[in-house]
UniProtKB/Swiss-Prot annotation:
Taxonomic lineage from the root: Eukaryota, Metazoa, Ecdysozoa, Arthropoda, Hexapoda
ABC transmembrane type-1 domain segment(s): 168-449, 793-1079
GO cellular component, one term: membrane
Membrane topology recorded in Swiss-Prot or TrEMBL: Multi-pass membrane protein
Tissues expressed in: Uniform expression in embryos.
Domain ABC transporter: 499-722, 1119-1352
Record has ATP-binding as a keyword: yes
Superkingdom of origin organism: Eukaryota
Protein family (similarity comment): Belongs to the ABC transporter superfamily. ABCC family. Conjugate transporter (TC 3.A.1.208) subfamily.
Keyword set, alphabetical order: ATP-binding, Developmental protein, Glycoprotein, Membrane, Nucleotide-binding, Repeat, Transmembrane, Transmembrane helix, Transport
Annotated region described as Disordered, given as residue ranges: 1-40, 466-492, 723-766
Protein name: Probable multidrug resistance-associated protein lethal(2)03659
Disulfide bonds: none
Length: 1374
């Protein structure tokens, strides 16, 4: 297997394949990220990671390994091996001739011919192509637009300011070619025909006319090819600049703007809208060159044939308004299609992000139907645009012929006799006009319309509301609302506080009459620890967001004196090493790092991770448990040196003992002397804070220390323990994680820790697969099969052949007509009018047939393409949703999304156009060859030679370009992954001032992509240039051959030369399009690759194995010798090990254990989400024998990470309209959300933002609880379902569950012991085994192992006594 490279810098991952591994650079060791080295070069590391070779190959450290990883950067750097730096781009050192002739591409062609290219074979991007430089220039230009008060900002003006001369200069070259060289060609053609027709005036100059023809063709090639490349190059740079600008803007969006702008929309801007820049700037010059050319050529033709010239030109001009209308329609259609594409991508993005929850709800099929419906609507809109393209393709072929027909018929009707010179001069001139007026000008109109539509979408995004620049430095910072300046008297008081808030009012929705925070007055002293508590949805997180500056104040005053660090309520990790996630761009301080790791209770996890803190954690921390993610996020915040730490409920995701450790050792220990604002629901810690803030409905309900609030009774109202118990919590003993009770073995990575992203235990990351070799015929067959099958293909092919027969027949008939007229004139005979009329009728019939057949063939092909796109998309979406969870752990979110965005965009829009081009050009070339062979069969010799040369050149080109296209596609995926990850962690990124670090990483990914894309367009243009040169040689042979083998008359010369001249554009374009077809088919290849995904199992069992509709009636659950692993590798270590236990019907079972003990894996086994041995029986039925939906529909789940979808509240509760509004309101009332939803503008129809960001995490968990109540299943699973809600709401919810699910079996995973202390039984798990299982009271008093006893005891003496009392009462009442 070839080594797969990884380009540095790599924020997203460190990729490896087999023996190839990536070692962090010294900058990575010091900063947590790979930054650019001084020459900004991309590099590939080939050294092993910082463990011994044996340990690396095994994927874990051996017992005897003495080379254990440390966080000491000096020790690490001592093991570094020399990097392999990517070489300088040969274009950077090429001279003028080399650049003009594309000689600098020879090394990559040579390498591509010998081997399969990958990222290691690329070069560093040119200085002018670097993303950061281009982004800086365009951002500066856009800022000038924003500061111009006199007019609306224009992205077009901003682009022209930066790239204007590079876009304008090619217009001069196009002007010279079109109005100079191409206009001269017909003149010399006429002279050459005159020579072979025996005209006396041309007798001595025929050879010179032939040479002039050849020279003009050569000059056209030498000017246009570099010009085309130059425009592609500048378009590519514009795209990079806009991508960088969009990413920077995304990092500045306010929460409100982010709610209105979905991540799918931002991804679509970069994947679909920006690439439309690639073609419009080239054709736009024809909007002014084309009209000038029409005037000049019309004048020249008028000089020769008089008013007849106007007939054809007017016909061509009459199509211009139609083209303008179609351009407008195309713009409107594209905008509508883009909106529908945004909607589809948003849905796909949400589904992929929440796939596990979707599977547990058994919602795959209904959501698949929704995406299918969205896809149909999207493709119906795209089809309208394709039909316009089909009309345009047909028009291109027949327009010049109709124009020629009108001019010649007019010329004949006027009583004049046309000669070969007249006929082929008109033909040549109209062919020139065809290129300009029928191809380039209409294309310019359509592409400019599409370009402007995309520009408007980017402009709209760039004008979205953004946060003001806030300087979170060591000095004081203010957020003072205009109109409410602080008085001089208050200034000194403000500076005495770490955080000072005066009369603050703020709201997320500017249109809402209600404030999220209202009348907030708060002074936080430097060095104090402040706890913020309150009911779910009371505004705790919003207060933190206001301090961060994320929630803008509507009135009042907020001042922060000092630098901030922040831990979010929902842990945010990116796909990188644990160390990268903790350092997050900060310099490496070994002593501080070790201290933070210890205080955040991560040492044990590091010891057991395959590569310690250099282990890849997976995208969004997918391979870690919730507790591990929370502690790594906390460590990131704590490692950052700041004076103020904002911790948004980091203790809810960990168990009681770890929470005690984090509070004692981290909050009160390591952060002693710093200001800490801690949002928490853990009341046992309240006696040990300096100040408590109680929030209710966005207002401060009470403020003070523990003793004063205890006397008011406000604290007691929040908890489940008695007032006496809480008073005794001051006697709690500090937690010692090194005590014997805490040295039980723990699994390092959560339930899917058995493999990291790479699917093994090595801690390495999965590398996206790159195909090799050519595109197989089977792939084409699969594509056309998806488009309607063999019959549809044959009908379309037959129609295309008939269309070309009609077109070639028209050309041949014209030659026949010219010969007939000239022969009659040569004999002094006049052809009768009846005969002339018959010729006119015949020619008219041929033209009409050409129009009909070309339209038919184009529409048929586009219809096939539309069907293929829909079926391919729906097929792979079905495969993805049916894939097992292992697939999602080894494939990045961005990589999967890439298939549904850029790859499907290629299949939808690019591939049909290329297919039409290839088919029509192939048939056109066949027609030309037939015509040439009919005139002089000997000309088939150079034609055959040309074909052989082109065939070998094409193969040489394809081997290189196909690999470059694949590498380009693979290098594109990290751009989307990085963008999506950054949008998810926006608050954390901004709070830690990491925007610049993230921007550099995004720029590095764009540079890696640019490296591949630039070489792709370079090799493409080099190939085109080479073919053009060969075409010039071919035309030279054809033209000069007439002097060696004189034809019978000038008409044959005119026919052959006009046909051969078309080859200079047609052949090179055709061969390039066949190559482009193969390259575009790589998108189909990447899409079809997902068709081979193995499904996780049948959804519905056969009738004989399907459980009864009333199943399960009892809710008994039996585990028999169950083993579970997260990889299909049967030899992999099991995460759950030989579990055997029985849960009785209607039993309430609490499941506890340290982070990574296997609690959530138990739930995965119940839902059959992973690979298992042994059996799970529910009411005596083996769940392995039934369909997945038969099983999952009968189990309700409240997941650990609550998931809401963008849409309405009703849609999130009941996406398929199965229940009445009354039923929904009843469920909301039972979970204490009725009042919250009632206060929304539209009640159940109120909008939910993407990811449910306009609701707190606790409220989202309550919505998930409402879903479970709606389903009324016999078995309920709660995985940390109330971890983020306050104790009072938790108590009310527990009461609701006890009432609503009295006759149900309930499994509850919880870190809060009081949540499960009244359960019938408690299951204690550790290292994937059940170590205790019994009633809570018995486990606390009679158990020999005392694991549960010790766990409860660690919560403190007072808490232990209160929990024991509740357990005893439950035991005695059972």
């Amino acid at each position: 297997m070839d080594k797969q490279p990884v380009l540095e810098p790599t924020f997203d991952s460190v990729s490896e394949r087999e023996n190839t591994s990536i070692e962090e650079s010294s900058l990575l060791e010091n900063n947590g990220f790979d930054h650019r080295n001084k020459d900004e070069s991309l590099s590939v590391n080939t050294s092993p990671p910082l463990v011994c070779r044996k340990c690396f190959e095994l994927g874990h450290q051996t017992e005897n390994c003495k080379q254990k990883l440390t966080v000491n950067s000096e020790n690490n750097s001592a093991q570094n091996e020399k990097e392999k730096v990517l070489p300088e781009n040969p274009r950077a050192r090429s001279n003028f001739i080399s650049s003009l002739c594309f000689w600098y591409t020879i090394p990559i062609f040579r390498k591509g011919y010998r081997k399969t290219l990958d990222s290691t074979d690329l070069y560093r991007p040119l200085e002018e192509q670097k993303s950061d430089i281009l982004g800086n220039r365009l951002c500066a230009s856009w800022e000038r637009e924003l500061k111009n008060d006199g007019r609306s900002p224009s992205l077009v003006r901003a682009l022209l300011r930066v790239f204007g001369w590079q876009l304008g200069f090619p217009g001069l070259a196009i002007f010279v070619v079109e109005l100079g060289l191409r206009t001269l060609q017909p003149i010399f053609l006429v002279k050459l025909i005159s020579y072979f027709s025996g005209e006396p005036d041309a007798a001595n100059a025929g050879f010179y006319y032939a040479v002039a023809q050849i020279v003009i063709s050569a000059l056209t090639v030498m000017i246009l090819t570099p010009t085309t490349f130059g425009i592609h190059h500048v378009c590519f740079k514009m795209r990079v600049a806009m991508g960088s600008m969009i990413f920077r803007k995304a990092l500045r969006l306010t929460k409100g703007a982010l709610g209105d702008t979905t991540s799918g929309h931002v991804v679509n801007l970069i994947s679909n809208d920006i690439p439309r820049l690639d073609s419009a700037p080239y054709t736009v010059h024809y909007l002014w060159v084309g009209p000038l050319q029409v005037l000049v050529i019309t004048y020249l033709m008028y000089q020769e044939i008089g008013i007849s010239a106007v007939f054809g030109v007017l016909f061509m001009l009459l199509f211009m308004p139609i083209q303008m209308y179609l351009g407008t329609r195309t713009s409107a259609i594209q905008l509508k299609a883009a909106e529908r594409t945004d909607n589809r991508i948003r849905m796909v993005n949400e589904i992929i992000s929440a796939i596990q929850v979707l599977k547990m709800y058994a919602w795959e099929q209904p959501f698949e139907q929704m995406v299918t419906h969205a896809r149909e609507k999207e493709m119906n809109t795209i089809r309208q645009g394709q039909y316009i393209r089909g009309f345009d393709f047909a028009r291109r072929i027949v327009l010049s012929r109709v124009a020629i027909f009108l001019s010649l018929v007019g010329y004949v009707i006027l009583g004049k006799v046309f000669t070969p010179e007249i006929a082929f001069m008109i033909t040549a001139y109209y062919n020139v006009l065809l290129a300009a007026m029928s191809i380039y000008v209409p294309s310019a109109i359509i592409q400019t319309a599409q370009f402007l539509t995309s520009i408007r979408r980017v402009e709209q995004f760039m004008q979205s509301e953004e946060l003001g620049s806030s300087d979170k430095s060591e000095g004081p910072s203010k957020d003072t609302v205009p109109g409410n300046p602080p008085s001089n008297n208050n200034e000194a008081d403000l500076l005495k506080s770490a955080i000072s808030i005066r009369d603050l009012k703020a709201k997320w929705d500017p249109n809402s009459p209600d404030y999220t925070l209202s009348g907030i007055n708060l002074e936080i002293k430097p060095g104090s620890v402040v706890a913020v508590i309150g009911l779910t949805g009371s505004g705790k997180s919003s207060l933190i967001q206001a301090i961060l500056g994320e929630l803008k104040a509507n009135s009042g005053q907020l001042q922060v004196n000092g630098s901030l660090s922040y831990t979010s309520q929902e842990s945010w990790l990116f796909s990188g090493t644990v160390r990268q996630n903790i350092l997050f761009g900060q310099p490496m301080d070994s002593q501080r790092y070790e201290e933070v790791v210890k205080k955040c209770a991560l040492e044990r996890d590091f010891d057991l991770l395959p590569l310690r803190d250099n282990t890849i954690v997976g995208e969004r921390g997918a391979t870690l448990s919730g507790g591990q993610k929370a502690r790594i996020s906390l460590a990131r915040s704590v490692y950052r040196k700041a004076s103020i730490y904002l911790l948004d409920d980091p203790l809810s995701a960990v168990d009681a003992s770890v929470a005690r450790h984090l509070f004692d050792q981290c909050v009160r220990g390591h952060l002693r002397g710093s200001t800490v604002v801690l949002v928490t629901h853990q009341e046992q810690f309240l006696p040990h804070v300096d100040q408590i803030v109680i929030l209710a409905n966005g207002q401060i309900k009470a403020l003070g220390d523990y003793e004063s609030l205890l006397k008011t009774g406000l604290i007691t109202g929040l908890g489940s323990l008695s007032k006496t118990d809480k008073a005794k919590t001051e006697e709690q003993e500090p937690l010692n994680l090194n005590s014997p009770d805490n040295k039980n073995e723990v699994t390092p990575i959560k339930e899917n820790s058995e493999q990291t992203v790479g699917g093994s235990s090595s801690g390495k990351e999965h590398v996206e697969r790159q195909e090799s070799g050519g595109i197989s015929l089977a792939l084409y067959r699969k594509y056309f099969q998806a488009g309607g099958g063999l019959v549809a293909f044959l009908v379309m092919l037959s129609s295309s052949v008939l269309a070309q027969v009609a077109v070639t027949g028209g050309d041949y008939f014209l030659t026949y007509w010219v010969k007939k007229e000239s022969t009659a004139a040569g004999h002094g005979e006049m052809e009768d009018m009846e005969s002339k009329s018959m010729d006119v009728y015949k020619y008219t019939l041929i033209i009409i047939l050409s129009v009909i057949m070309n339209l038919s063939s184009s529409f048929l092909l586009f219809n096939i393409a539309k069907k293929a796109s829909i079926r391919l998309h729906n097929t792979i979406f079905n495969r993805v949703t049916r894939a097992d969870m292992h697939f999602f752990s080894i494939n990045k979110h961005g990589s999967i999304l890439n298939r549904f965005t850029k790859d499907m965009s290629q299949v939808d829009e690019v591939l049909p156009v290329v297919l039409v081009d290839v088919m029509q050009i192939a048939l056109w070339l066949a027609g030309i060859i037939i015509v040439i062979a009919n005139v002089n069969p000997l000309l088939l010799v150079p034609t055959l030679m040309l074909s052989v040369i082109f065939y070998h050149l094409r193969n040489l080109y394809l081997k290189t370009s196909r690999d470059l296209k694949r590498v380009e596609a693979i290098n594109r995926s990290p751009v989307y992954s990085h963008l999506a990850a950054s949008l998810n962690g926006l608050t954390t990124i901004r709070a830690l001032d990491a925007q610049r670090v993230l921007e550099k990483e995004f720029d590095s990914y764009q540079d890696a992509h640019s490296s591949a894309f630039f070489m792709y367009i370079s090799t493409s243009q080099a190939f085109g240039y080479c073919m053009n040169c060969i075409c010039v040689i071919y035309i030279s042979i054809i033209t000069l051959s007439f002097f060696a083998f004189p034809p019978g008359n000038g008409a044959d010369v005119g026919l052959v030369i006009t046909q051969a001249m078309g080859l200079i554009d047609m052949v090179q374009w055709g061969v390039r399009q066949t190559a482009e077809l193969e390259n575009t088919m790589t998108a189909v290849e990447r899409v079809v690759e997902y068709e081979s995904i193995e499904p996780e199992g049948m959804l519905e069992a056969p009738d004989d194995k399907k459980p009864p509709k009333t199943w399960p009636e009892q809710g008994e659950i039996i585990f028999k010798e169950l083993n579970l692993r997260y990889t299909p590798n049967a030899k992999a270590e099991n995460v759950l090990k030989s579990l055997s236990f029985v849960i009785q019907p209607r039993e309430k079972v609490g499941i506890v254990g340290r982070t990574g003990a296997g609690k959530s894996s138990l739930i995965n086994a119940l839902f059959r989400l992973s690979y298992t041995d042994g059996s799970v029986l529910i009411d005596t039925r083996d769940t392995r024998q039934m369909g997945l939906h038969d099983l999952r529909r009968q189990i309700s789940i409240i997941p650990q990470e609550p998931v809401l979808f963008s849409g309405t509240m009703r849609y999130n509760l009941d996406p398929f309209d199965e229940y009445s509004d009354e039923k929904l309101w009843g469920c909301l009332e039972e979970v204490k959300l009725k009042e919250v939803v009632s206060d929304l503008p539209d009640g159940l129809a109120s909008k939910i933002s993407e990811g449910g960001t306009n609701f707190s995490v606790g409220q989202r968990q309550l919505v998930c609880l409402a879903r479970a109540i709606l389903r009324e299943n016999r078995i309920l699973v709660m995985d940390e379902a109330t971890a983020n809600v306050d104790p009072q709401t938790d108590g009310l919810i527990q009461a609701t569950i006890r009432s609503k699910f009295r006759d149900c079996t309930v499994l509850t995973i919880a870190h809060r012991l009081h949540t499960i202390i009244d359960s019938d039984k408690v299951m204690v798990m550790d290292a994937g085994r059940v170590v205790e299982f019994g009633s809570p009271y018995e486990l606390m008093t009679k158990s020999d192992s005392k694991v549960f006893h010790n766990l409860v005891n660690q919560s403190g003496r007072a808490s232990y006594e209160g929990l024991l009392k509740i357990a005893q009462e439950t035991f005695e009442s059972s």
